[in-house]
Swiss-Prot record:
GO BP term (any one): dendrite development
Membrane-crossing residue ranges in chain numbering: none
Protein's recorded name: Zinc finger E-box-binding homeobox protein zag-1
Transcription regulation as UniProt keyword: yes
Gene name per UniProt: zag-1
InterPro entries: HD, Homeobox_CS, Homeodomain-like_sf, Znf_C2H2_sf, Znf_C2H2_type, ZnF_E-box_Homeobox
Length: 596
């Protein structure tokens, strides 16, 4: 029982009000807070200070609670991941599919292989691919169109980030018709333009600035810089190095420049221009529609039906055996008639000296679709496909650099160096690609891709699951400390140290009365109050006392507004007989009386 004089204050004004508890007042406005750190975060609203920043989306926050909520929800992952995904190119997908099917088929050892063979085979393959694209179905026998559409001028822009200026060229085109296969003379250009149409004979020049005038008639032509001139021996050395490694390091560039006695920048620009030329020559869309129709019309005369890749190779073999001599003669004739004038970065040329010739001759160089270029094509266009296969769990995609460090012996290679197969011995560097299970996964992955946008979105959802926030501790000067075992971030080092007990399972603070142990010291302090009966926290309205600060805070924040104050009650007859004292009880029977 509680005496009235001890339980009730002398006057009602002595009870601390809510305004008295909010002793931390904002100097800018009339708001007041119970805790100092609430005032600090409120002042940031006036000052505009936002000390917390997300490392993923770089969004800043003024309140630690908003920052913690943002980091826990990981909303910024979905916004950052689409930029990491390269969309599919339908032409590249079809090329990749056909290459994989060719690798899956048995090797035909009786088929000859020369520099011109790959060119002829790729022209047939391109014609078949374009025909399937127009029909919207799988590769089928090609038919001669009634009226081939005239190709439109098209400018292909090669984006080379390291090239400081633009390289331009003039391309001469001429159409020649042979008995077996009509071929078109198009010299792959290290330039910013292409010839508009195969029907236009003569010199057609389109530079990057949109001018179509001939360079010889312009009064602004000046001689090339002396550093841009390379003799035949220097170009031969550069071509040999390019065959071995089209992407040399800066140390290899310096070594090559020292070997041929030129500046490193000259070698670097030569490699960049040559790579651009290779990309342009290997790009399917760069083939004019007119040449596609011509190739398709010529292929229609062949009795072979192009239903499968094996039949396509048979058609190529038949064509080569019938027209090898005429094709070789026509290629030599076109090489003599074509003229490539490669200009310096300033767009200058000199009639007295021979400018830098970046064209690859067919005598001492490999064909356009050589094994090295095919490997580069697979590496450049198959990155997204490799990611799909890697996520599928097969793990059969190999690294080209790792394979190059382990040369394959001649007896271990599936195709010997002296074999006449159309697929050379470089296939041995990718033995696991020939796995039927892997190819089935590749086919399934390719069939699921309907458009480049769908590819990007599907890969985005898969890669977002793999992304994780940095688990390394942040710098102390940033004021944030992250746990190295989870995604939580703390503003103090001591808070991080206490949090690590959650992962380690240690309970260093033990009670000396019972056997309980706690991870944090303040938990032990509050636990000891259960043994001692101490309740230092009391509600000033209902006079209820609490031993734990958390219970007291919850009561003050949620129940203080409607908890019933204590009032006098008439004493029961037994109380009057015993002592005659008047008791105080809460107005609500649900609220327990205050404990002392």
């Amino acid at each position: 029982m509680v005496d009235i004089a001890e339980a009730m204050p002398t006057t009602a004004s002595s009870l601390p009000s809510d305004e008295a508890l909010r002793k931390f007042k904002c100097p800018e406005c009339t708001k007041a807070f119970k805790f100092k750190h609430h005032l600090k975060e409120h002042i940031r609203i006036h000052s505009g200070e936002k000390p917390f920043e997300c490392q993923q989306c770089h969004k800043r926050f003024s309140h630690s609670g908003s920052y913690s909520s943002h980091m826990s929800s990981k909303k910024c992952v979905q916004q950052a991941s689409p930029s990491m995904v390269t969309p599919f190119n339908p032409y590249q997908l079809m090329m990749y599919r056909n290459i994989m099917l060719q690798l899956q088929t048995p090797q035909v050892s009786f088929l000859p292989s020369t520099a011109a063979n790959n060119m002829d085979y790729m022209s047939l393959l391109q014609a078949n691919l374009f025909q399937s694209l127009e029909n919207g179905t799988s590769p089928t026998p090609t038919q001669e169109p009634s009226a081939p559409a005239s190709p439109e001028p098209k400018i292909e822009v090669v984006d080379e980030p390291e090239v400081s200026s633009e390289v331009k060229t003039e391309v001469k085109t001429e159409v020649k018709t042979e008995d077996s296969v009509p071929e078109e003379s198009i010299t792959p250009a290290v330039s910013m333009s292409l010839s508009p149409a195969p029907e236009q004979n003569g010199n057609e020049s389109m530079n990057n600035g949109g001018s179509g005038s001939d360079g010889k008639s312009s009064p602004d032509w000046r001689p090339l810089r002396s550093r841009s001139f390379l003799n035949d021996s220097q170009v031969a050395v550069l071509q040999n190095h390019f065959k071995r490694n089209p992407f040399p390091s800066k140390y290899e560039l310096s070594a090559v420049a020292e070997q041929i006695g030129v500046n490193k920048r000259v070698v670097q620009v030569w490699f960049q221009n040559t790579r651009a030329k290779e990309r342009r020559s290997n790009r399917l869309p760069s083939m004019p529609r007119g040449s596609v129709a011509s190739a398709a019309a010529a292929a229609a005369t062949s009795p072979t039906v192009w239903q499968t890749p094996v039949q396509l190779m048979a058609a190529w073999a038949s064509q080569f055996s019938n027209g090898n001599n005429s094709l070789t003669a026509s290629q030599d004739e076109r090489n003599n008639e074509n003229t490539d004038e490669v200009m310096d970065h300033d767009g200058l040329k000199d009639g007295k000296e021979t400018p830098l010739d970046l064209t690859l001759s067919t005598d001492d160089t490999e064909p356009e679709w050589s094994p090295e270029k095919l490997i580069g094509f697979l590496d450049q266009t198959g990155g997204v496909i490799q990611e799909l296969l890697r996520q599928a769990g097969n793990g059969f995609v190999t690294n080209q650099e790792d394979e190059e460090e382990k040369p394959i012996k001649a007896e271990e290679s599936p195709v010997s160096s002296g074999s006449s197969s159309i697929w050379p011995s470089f296939i041995g560097q990718y033995p696991s690609i020939l796995d039927s299970a892997s190819l089935s996964v590749l086919e399934k992955a390719l069939d699921q891709q309907k458009s480049s946008e769908d590819d990007a979105s599907s890969l985005c959802s898969n890669e977002s699951k793999l992304l994780k926030f940095p688990t390394t501790p942040l710098k102390e000067e940033e004021g944030l400390f992250s746990c190295d075992q989870c995604d939580k971030v703390f503003g103090k080092q001591s808070s991080l140290a206490r949090h690590k007990y959650e992962h380690s399972g240690q309970r260093p603070y033990k009670c000396d009365i019972c056997e309980k142990a706690f991870k944090h010291k303040h938990h032990l302090t509050e636990h000891k109050r259960l043994h001692s009966g101490e309740k230092p926290f009391q509600c000033d309205k209902c006079l209820k006392r609490f031993s734990h600060s958390g219970s007291y805070s919850q009561h003050m924040n949620h129940r203080y507004s409607y908890c019933k104050p204590y009032r006098e009650q008439p004493a029961s007859p037994s109380d009057v007989l015993n002592g005659g004292s008047v008791t105080v009880s809460p107005s609500s029977s649900n609220t327990p009386p205050p404990s002392t």
